[in-house]
């Protein structure tokens, strides 16, 4: 039985790693795979299962941090990315504009404020199957609109051409994506495209902006719930974390490689199909009614 539970932990880590940064909603997939199928709460307990989801999310976040480690070092002016010794202000200003720490902070502000004000409310009232289906569907429509608009944009911007206003607006869309199922990456990439970024630039900024705020949010949640972790369940947590981290590395690199080629509409169609599938299970067969 213990082996079966470990396998379930690995499966959940894989699902988290595949979906956390893809524009398909990790929440929707965790409801489908865990709450409707594997039911980790039955062998971990509801509180410990919630903490497990925080841990595997951290695995995905660390994967994104690793993929973008060079960019983060550059943003923080660490190591070889710091200013050249003796370089004057005029020389610095003459360099091409680069994404900097202020862009990231400006993008984080809306979600940070909303999270501090409404995190408990969202956790208690919006994590139901119907609300997640709404988020999945509305987010899919938004992605389709963004992709249709992007066809009309000539010479879309790169990530280093983002200005502070664009960063703030994309940050607002990250705050909107706190509605479960809407998808953080789906929302922010769509908004970035609507703000005349190319898909790769919007994806890059989405991940760069998401890492610090998700680390902070998941870290705080883990501090609040760490006492729910049982010693006997630690192998379950470790395997789930490692699965999410490993699969997350592969998924993020693959998505970034394909982001300018396959766009958002295929993901939007997939989300609509997912909504229909979950709706059939929920309304037709009563699966997940207790969620």
Curated annotation (Swiss-Prot):
Keywords: Antibiotic resistance, Cell membrane, Cell shape, Cell wall biogenesis/degradation, Hydrolase, Membrane, Peptidoglycan synthesis, Transmembrane, Transmembrane helix. Its EC number is 3.6.1.27. This is Undecaprenyl-diphosphatase. It catalyses: di-trans,octa-cis-undecaprenyl diphosphate + H2O = di-trans,octa-cis-undecaprenyl phosphate + phosphate + H(+). Belongs to the UppP family. The gene is uppP. The keyword Cell wall biogenesis/degradation applies. It comes from Staphylococcus aureus. The chain crosses the membrane at residues 1-21, 48-68, 102-122, 126-146, 162-182, 203-223, 231-251, 267-287. It is a multi-pass membrane protein. HAMAP family: Undec_diphosphatase. Bacitracin is thought to be involved in the inhibition of peptidoglycan synthesis by sequestering undecaprenyl diphosphate, thereby reducing the pool of lipid carrier available. NCBIfam families: PRK00281.1-4, undec_PP_bacA. Catalyzes the dephosphorylation of undecaprenyl diphosphate (UPP). Confers resistance to bacitracin. Is also required for virulence. One of its GO terms (molecular function) is undecaprenyl-diphosphatase activity. It comes from the Bacteria.
């Amino acid at each position: 039985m213990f082996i079966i539970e470990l396998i379930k932990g690995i499966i959940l880590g894989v699902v988290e790693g595949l979906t956390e940064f893809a524009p398909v909603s990790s929440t929707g997939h965790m409801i489908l795979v865990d709450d409707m199928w594997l039911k980790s709460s039955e062998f971990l307990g509801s509180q410990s299962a919630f903490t497990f989801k925080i841990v595997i999310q951290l695995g995905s976040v660390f994967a994104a941090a690793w993929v973008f480690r060079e960019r983060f070092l550059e943003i923080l002016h660490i190591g070889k990315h710091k200013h050249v010794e003796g370089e004057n202000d005029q020389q610095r200003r003459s360099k091409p504009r680069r994404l900097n720490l202020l862009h990231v902070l400006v993008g984080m502000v809306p979600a940070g404020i909303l999270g501090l004000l409404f995190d408990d409310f969202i956790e208690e009232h919006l994590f139901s199957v119907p609300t997640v289906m709404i988020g999945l569907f509305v987010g899919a429509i938004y992605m389709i609109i963004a992709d249709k608009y992007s066809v009309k944009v000539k010479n879309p911007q790169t990530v280093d051409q983002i200005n502070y206003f664009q960063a703030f607006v994309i940050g607002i869309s990250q705050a909107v994506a706190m509605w479960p199922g809407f998808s953080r990456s789906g929302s922010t990439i769509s908004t970035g495209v609507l703000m005349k970024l190319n898909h790769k630039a919007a994806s890059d900024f989405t991940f760069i902006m998401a890492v610090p705020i998700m680390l902070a949010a998941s870290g705080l949640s883990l501090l609040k719930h760490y006492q729910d972790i049982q010693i006997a369940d630690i192998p379950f947590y470790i395997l789930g974390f490692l699965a999410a981290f490993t699969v997350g590395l592969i998924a993020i690199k693959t998505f970034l490689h394909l982001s300018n080629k396959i766009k958002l509409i295929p993901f939007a169609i997939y989300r609509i199909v997912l909504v229909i599938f979950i709706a059939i299970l929920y309304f037709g067969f009563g699966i997940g009614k207790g969620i």
